[in-house]
Amino acid sequence: MTTDPAQAPTRARSQHQRRKRIVQAAAALASRGGVEAMQMRTVAERAGVALGTLYRYFPSKMDLVVAVVSEEMDLLEGSMERRPPGSSTPASRAVELLMRATRGLMREPELADALIRSLLLSDVKTNFGSRMTGMLLRVASEGEATDGQRTLVGALNSVWVMEMIEILRGHATPEETHERLDVAAQRLLADF
């Protein structure tokens, strides 16, 4: 059985659209009831795919959570490219990006909580930290970043993750988080 090479782009587009529907269905369920609401059978039904198809794309629920996080990161990167942080200092540009991410996540607090909890408790390797660090480096550094700068920006990213946890637990407001991120960024990125 041979396949027509002319059909390959159509098949790839169809697979991409199917994957996108699955991720969107999972995100919608998580935003209403956390990761617990992301039952694989329910995700498959909402996405209009067979359960076996869902498992072919995402062998576990955690793989699906990682895909949802990746989609959120794509949205943040797109936002940053369309509207780069305009602040005058590296520290304030980094904080502007982190607060943009915070506002984006807090539009769907159930989803944010589900994603952060799952990532913290998961054994699945993700590139979330390195992607966020990369975005922070792009807005904060001028030119090629040094290893020391990568370490400092990674530390700022870790502060932000903890601040997100505090917001989600109801122990901090976005305003308090903004203040603390300002202080941390000013100190960590002082030599950028």
What spans do the regions from the language model cover?
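Alpha-helical DNA-contacting segments of helix-turn-helix folds
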Residues: A30, V65-E72, L119, F128
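Hydrophobic alpha-helical connector segments
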Residues: A67, G78-R107
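Short, hydrophobic secondary-structure boundary micro-motifs
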Residues: Q39, A112-I116, E176
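Short linear capping/connector segments at secondary-structure termini
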Residues: R82, A114-S122
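Short hydrophobic/aromatic patch on the recognition helix
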Residues: G48-F58
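Basic, helix-initiating cap at the start of DNA-binding domains
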Residues: M1-G33, A37-R46, D63-V66
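Amphipathic alpha-helical packing segments from all-alpha helical-bundle domains
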Residues: E77, E96, L119-I165, E175-L189
